[in-house]
Amino acid sequence: MAVAPTSYDILMGTFRSPYLYTLTFDVLARKLQVREVNEATGGHNWLDVSPDGNTLYATVWGEPPKLTSYDIVRGGEYATTKLSRNVASQYMSGYVCSNNKAMYSACGPQVDTFLVDDNGTLLDQPAVQSFNLLQGQEKNKANGTLDFGGLRHGGHSADLSPDGTKLYVADIGRNCVWMYHVDRETGLLTEASKNIATRPHDGPRHAWPHPNGRIVYSLQEHSSYVDAFRLTDDNKLEFLEGGCIIPDEKDHDKYWADEVRLSPMADVVFGSTRGLEEGTPGFVTAWNLRPDGTFASTEATHRFQTKTSGGWANAIAVCPNLGPNGEVFMTLTDSEVGFIQILAYTSDKGFEVVDELKISTEKEHIMPATTVWL
């Protein structure tokens, strides 16, 4: 059983502020603190760490659209970041992931492939592949104004299968999850299938694979469901079952789901949702899983009501190892007020807030977005 170290470095981006935060979480003291505020090229709403752990990739919310790679500098008391390269993007990206050949970007109207060098740095060149996700008259709207609106109504995420041979792209606007085959020698993609969501109003936002490679969890932004799909023939996804993040009595139209992630042992799946307006708290929900990745029950094992709506965030990122008492640690970011929490979860006791840090100041409203654990 994997056991957490005594402390972790965590990197955190924001939606609008040019800062990258280095945080440390002391597992035994159960304490989270800011160690460094690194200079950033803009607001980084999504972060990804290269497979070797030496490069940070980031989306940039700003004009002109671009993507960024940073060197992760280690050797001191805590990790810091150093800019390695900016590259232009046709549209503002919402999500990136990487292997040792390429970085993949979901940016609303399309999915892009950017190549990286042997050190993981983005090459100083445009995307080598772009897959248009728009259909019919939608293509006429695909111009420079499709920034945040494009992300809200288009391709929103990109994640690789555990063996690195497939890329899953959740597309809110097309109500589907696209599958691409990955050439591991070159990093290039080939479109494989378009997998329509179960409900006409689902709006897939993120698609996260189980370590066994056969199950993919699709987070539905509009309906607040976490759905399990099975990879059927290496080309298509088949719906199995789903659980709702919010309680039955809540109005789905007042929420927009944000994130889906697994516990370190892949025996629990977590989903989070935000309130559409201030005064509507969001939820983080957990379901126990069978060893094959299917739901033990689609009824929630535990729910946690968040302190605020979460703003644009209420994003969870799970610690890669269990805590000393078998607990699952995760970060929860809030952009409404501007704080980050560490949550601990066990299937027996549910969720608890371990620590909280206010990031916003009286002089500046800072909007925490997402984190990565190092």
UniProtKB/Swiss-Prot annotation:
Instruction: Enumerate the Pfam families for this protein.
Output: Lactonase
> Origin, by domain of life?
Eukaryota
Give the E.C. number(s).
5.5.1.1
Listed GO biological process terms:
beta-ketoadipate pathway
Q: Which reaction does it catalyse?
A: (S)-muconolactone = cis,cis-muconate + H(+)
The Swiss-Prot or TrEMBL record annotates one GO molecular function as: 6-phosphogluconolactonase activity
Q: Which residues form a coiled coil?
A: none
Question: Which InterPro entries does this entry report, sorted A to Z?
Answer: Cycloisomerase_2, Lactonase_7-beta_prop, WD40/YVTN_repeat-like_dom_sf
The entry's function note states:
Catalyzes a syn cycloisomerization.
Q: What is this protein called?
A: Muconate cycloisomerase 1
| Organism this protein belongs to | Cutaneotrichosporon cutaneum
